[in-house]
Regions:
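Non-catalytic helical/linker scaffolds that mediate oligomerization, partner binding
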Residues: 1-492
């Protein structure tokens, strides 16, 4: 319904709960932990109070040792383990406060014996597959093995849903390279990540993850508390505006709002503000110059083609880079170089069309299936024209693969001026000119030539000069550097 009312197609991502640890139930729904007091934490099922409460993790007694920390409710409450006796973990309250049912529990810097997927994750994943959703945001991914467990279910159901691995703990950060190889993208989920690792490490980790995702050509989302104050206030803090801008400058593909739009007082204003910050950052901060010399650590033929296409587009000031793609991989490769030219992904797949919504700078169009390279390129250009993404006379860079319909074979670059070639000849000026053609046989009867007109005649003489001065360009059949047209052009 939202798509129809807005006239825009969107991609949809489902977020899994992941293998979380939470507090159990309390006698009065809550309790207050006093700083300096002792409280016992146990995996046993019981109604908790200020002296003892339960958590939903059976192996907590074996995974912890004296000196370890337990953080509750996004780190608002901190406990220090003093001793462990059977199923009872004795702790000292370092930071007290109110604790209640089902609050999140974090065990910083610990490798936990949690499953990759819980039953609810599997049910949610199957729901997303049935409804043909585009991505699954997999929570608390710790290693490539976790990604493969999710992939196994997706492939079992014959789905092509993309996996976005949420990096939310120290294990995920440590194993980011193998996660990036196996996932379709990553999310820097800074909420839980900022509890699991020291807050001062989060900015550095964010930059490293974004850089590694950029190098491999996988989309990366930066999320959590980006405009947190706008849950309550109509304007963000200056620090939040800088945070959004810096994520963009780091190279993130997407910036994500969560609580601001899900539960905040100003959801629409939050979106508008984030959009304004993003556009201003890319326009004013040397964003494209910063990325134009980006060199990946490992070159492949498709990657080299993408790099060359971006350099060509910059040198020729092309209006667009059109990538004919069946899987979307070529468009992702082009995107990572952050070209100034528009990136158009022409694909026959509606699934790929939607999934590319997440990739920086890519606008997708649906084309027909084609068996030949020329037909595929023509279809891509014509569809882009019909969608209003390019115009006749625009110079575009086109990438494609031969043979057609084979993924990962991008090996062709073509430079083309959009439009049907009626005549060709030699030009004296630079750049591309488009306008309304005015065919003139008699200058005295031509009437007024307007600034957007292109004057066309067999030849010119002194009587044509007033018309030529007003015209945007002129074309004559009688050529040569010593012709009247050429001499007049050089003198203007």
């Amino acid at each position: 319904e939202a798509e129809k009312s807005a006239g825009r197609e969107i991609a949809i991502m489902i977020d899994t709960m992941g293998p979380e640890i939470r507090t159990g139930k309390f006698k009065d729904q809550k309790a207050f932990l006093v700083q300096g007091s002792e409280v016992i934490v146990t995996p046993d099922d019981l109604l908790g109070d200020e002296r003892k409460f339960s958590v939903t993790y059976d192996y907590i007694c074996t995974d912890l040792k004296p000196g370890d920390r337990i953080l509750i409710d996004d780190g608002l409450i901190e406990l220090m383990v003093t001793k462990i006796e059977k199923n009872d973990i004795y702790t000292n309250v370092i930071t007290g406060g109110e604790i209640s049912n089902n609050k999140g529990v974090n065990l910083p810097n610990k490798k936990l014996s949690l499953p990759s997927l819980i039953d609810k994750d599997i049910a949610d994943l199957e729901f997303g597959i049935r409804h043909k959703l585009d991505y699954v945001a997999a929570s608390f991914v710790r290693s490539g093995k976790d990604v493969l467990e999710i992939r196994k279910i997706i492939e079992r159901e014959n789905s092509d849903m993309d996996i976005i691995a949420k990096i939310e703990n120290a294990e995920g950060v440590e194993n980011i390279e193998e996660i990036l190889v196996l996932a379709d993208g990553v999310m820097v989920a800074r909420g839980d990540l900022g509890v699991e690792i020291p807050p001062e490490e989060v900015p550095v980790v964010q930059k490293k993850i974004i850089k590694q995702a950029n190098i491999i050509g996988k989309p990366v989302i930066t999320a959590t508390q980006m405009l947190d104050s706008m849950m309550r206030n109509p304007r963000p803090t200056r620090a939040e505006a800088s945070d959004v801008a810096n994520a963009i400058l780091d190279g993130t593909d997407a910036i994500m709002l969560s609580g601001e739009t899900a539960a905040g007082k100003y959801p629409l204003l939050s979106v508008v503000m984030m959009d304004r910050i993003a556009k201003k950052t890319e326009k004013e901060m040397g964003f494209f110059e910063k990325n134009e010399n980006f060199i990946p650590l490992k070159n492949t033929i498709p990657d080299s083609i993408a790099s060359a296409a971006c350099r060509l587009s910059r040198n020729l000031e092309a209006k667009a880079i059109i990538t004919s793609t069946t899987s979307g991989s070529t468009a992702k490769m082009v995107s990572k170089y952050r070209p100034q030219s528009r990136i158009i992904a022409a694909t026959p797949s509606e699934r790929v069309y939607k999934k590319l919504k997440l990739v920086w700078g890519v606008e997708s169009v649906i084309t027909s299936q084609n068996d030949g390279t020329d037909e595929m390129i023509r279809s891509a250009v014509n569809t882009s024209l019909m969608e209003g993404l390019i115009s006749n006379g625009d110079l575009v860079i086109i990438t494609a693969g031969v043979p057609v319909k084979v993924q990962g074979t991008t090996n062709l670059i073509k430079v083309e001026v959009v439009g049907k070639v009626i005549v060709s000849g030699s030009g004296l000026g630079e750049g591309t000119i488009s306008g309304r053609v005015r065919l003139v046989r008699d200058p005295a009867a031509a009437g007024e030539i307007e600034a957007e007109d292109i004057l066309v005649s067999y030849s010119t003489d002194k009587d044509y000069v007033p018309l030529m001065k007003n015209a945007k360009a002129f074309v004559t059949e009688m050529g040569g550097l010593t012709s009247h047209t050429a001499i007049a052009a050089y003198s203007m």
